From Swiss-Prot:
Cited InterPro entries: Znf_GATA (IPR000679), Znf_NHR/GATA (IPR013088)
GO term, biological process aspect, one: regulation of DNA-templated transcription
SMART domains: ZnF_GATA
Basic residues bias locations: 393-412
ZnF (GATA-type) residues: 241-266
Keyword hit for Zinc: yes
Biased composition (Pro residues): 148-157
Organism: Dictyostelium discoideum
Record-given protein name: GATA zinc finger domain-containing protein 5
The UniProt record lists the keyword Zinc-finger: yes
Amino acid sequence: MDYQLHEGKQISQEFPTDISTTKSSDLKSRKTDSPSIQRTHEFVNFSVFPIVNTNEIMNVDIKHFSPDLKCPTSPNIFLQPLTTTPNTTPNTSTTIDSNTEINPIEIQLQSPLLFQPEHLSPQTLKTTIPTFSIPTYPTPLNTKFQSSPPPPPPPPAATTTTTITTTTTTSAGNSTTKNNNNNNNNNNNNNGKSPKQFQDVLIPVTSSGKDGALYTVLENVPIKRTHRRRSANIDKDSLKCYQCNTSNTPEWRKGPEGPATLCNACGLAYAKKQKLTKNNIKFNQSTNVNNNTNNTITQLNQQINNQGLPNLTSTTTTSNNTAAAVNITTPSKRNNKYNTHRSKVFGEVAPSIVYTNGTLNNVGTPVSDTKKSHTFHEYMTPSNSFFTGKPIKTTKTKPKPKSKSKPGKITHTKHEQPQLNEQVQAIMEKNNLLSSSGGSGGAGSSSSSCGTSLNSSLGSSSGTITNSGGGSSGGGGGNLFSNQQLGFTCINNNVSNNNSNNNINNNDKQIQQQIQQVQQQVHQQVQQQLQQQQQVQQQQQQINQEPFLNQQNHYYQNIFQNVSTGNQNCAINTNGGFPQFESPMDIFPYNNNTTNCTQDSNGFVPNLANFEMQGNVLYNSSGSPSSLGQYVIQNNSFSGPNDQNPYVPSVSLNSNKTTNIKNNNNNKKNSKNKNNKNNKNNNNNTKINNHHINNNKNNVNTNQTIIKENNSQKQHQQQQQQQQQQQEQQKQQQEQQKQQEEQQQNLSINNSNQTNENEILGTTTTTTTSTATIITSQVPMNLSPNSDDNQSSSNYSTLSDSGSSPTDSFSGLSVNTPHPNCDSFSSSINNGSNCGSDIETIESPLQMSTDVLTINNCSSNRTTATNNNINNNNNNNNNNNNNNNKCSIKDDTFNLLTNSNLDSFGIIDCINGSSTNTNSFFMETPLLINDEDLLSSSNLTSSSELLPHSFV
């Protein structure tokens, strides 16, 4: 036989010098830089073998092989390094004689990953690393001998990831391309999976090419890493849940991907799911066991059904009965026997006792004698049912505890017995006591007790007794049986007790009705009070929202009105003073044409001199409010009975409350009387009613006290809110005043550029402040002396009192706008002489706006206004001033500021030379005062003109 040995191509492999410190990712980058050692390997490829007998193969001597093929002598050594020899004849072939015998047992495959003991491991090699060849042995082309199986997989290499490929192809081009493709495939496989979960292991893979040649390649096969417990030093901030992708959790739990891969919620859900699956597995195993046992039972039942025997099982509370087998051959006969058995059982009892489900309870047994009972349904099926081969389900009844009943009291016991009429009917039928008419019984007793009527109503034992009973009184008709036979107690009801109970029930109903009425009344009172509070709040809101200082002809209710001092009938002027109030007031204008106070003194305005207001009530000096008459205060305003006065409407105070209180008292009295009459019949009921009434009174009192406390709290809160609102308004007004003053200064500066010879501008020298605050939104304009009068500004800087009446001095009076008709303001009180000034005392700063200042009886040579600001008025005003010998200033304001130590401020009167004509200013804008003692009467003079006032 001829064997032809084809020698494979020499393949070289480069290795870096230091592989212990080299990573798999750096092999490509360091391939060209690091020094390498060229290793040449020779492989033998055997192909096209004839059929060889076994005896011939065993006789082959190994020496006839090529010297390049090295066969190790030791069976334990599978890998030997080759010497570095150049290959000069890569494609040589040798011919083997036909007499050559080959022993395949002696030809062993060399493993690439097993080393001899004397050699070093690849991790310790520094400079030279031997390469290893994997020669193949000849494979005959018969069915008996095939290629040897691949060696077992070696242990995983931790650091070495170099791919070693061995090919046995004959062409150089095919070997290089296949190596490159394999490397690319390995890289793609590794890159496609997460490096954390997989690691590469070198595994030899043998395959055959298209030409039938075999080649072996060591491939990097990714193997899934084993789960390792995470260390305690792991950065938990970088963790994220694999399920919900959250990073904020109190605890990390184990998931299918490993520990610390699920958040707390997802981990608990996963653990629960795993537990359910385990339980389901156990349940399925148990169900399989039960199915096996059930199959055996069903087989037995099928055998019984085939024989026509019923499988009836029953369970009771005391014992368990086994299945009873009846000798019935066919189902029809079985049913017949069943019906006969049923008829026998039911013949012993009354038909009415048998229920639809075929059960029978204890009949005629008292509660104390009730014990565990057997029911027929435990061993008997209904007639309309068919035997199915399954046992009938029964319910176990537990014995109920015996109820302890006291003598003389009714105990409502619950027991599982038929109704009374059914028991009676059953006993009657059992004892042949028919309901048809029979012989008349004995005379029944007339007493109402049901226990003693039996002996007198039954008569002879042989006769039948009708249900209608004997006796003229009918005592035996409803009471045929004693309590010993029926098993229940007889109740004796007294008529008196029934009547008393009925009376108690009726009285209770009346008491409940009275309670409901009182509660309704209290509820109505509370609602009325709440409505009144809401109305007051609405009125206050309206007052706060109204810009009353900016509106023309806006008037409030006047308390007292003012005319000239020539008429002494004015009530306030006769006493020479203003009343003292504790709440803010307005000063409003009064018609200048009115010259007397007769109309006011007749009832429109009360005599309020020397009166003080304390808690919404006016008191005089003696402490009695009698002089006020029928005038009352509502919402900080006066009201009286006279409807003709538009400023004083007639409104009564608390009229609704008084009527409600009276009605409530009357209702209470009536309810008490009715209760007393009803309670005379029954003392117990009277006590109960009184108890309820007292409780109701206490409830009403507590409700009233609660309402009062709530009202007081609400009033206190409202006062606080009002104070806060006032403070806020004051702050806003002060800011507005500052802004207005700045605007005025800017206007005065702008007007100074356009002054003519007739226009003279002054300077402001306001330096004083006041303890009271001005609640106005108007723009003040200060008056200054006219330059035509040749008066110095010093005459207007201060005003002091030098008159007969003692008054406090003023400081800081400044005037910006010229005074056209008066020569000057004097610093002393002249009591109406030579156009001087009268200072009358009122305790607050004064602001006046349009149509504020009216000067009467000025000199004729001063009637024509020379200032351009004054000329802005209509000419009609000047003509009227000339005709009436009066002059007025409009569209301008002046401001009087008091010193902090003053108790009053002055109203300046510009008077002509004569003291007989005393005239005053009339203000058309409210003056708001915020002091406890608003007005003082000690500093008033006879020449003063009083101003109209009213509450806010």
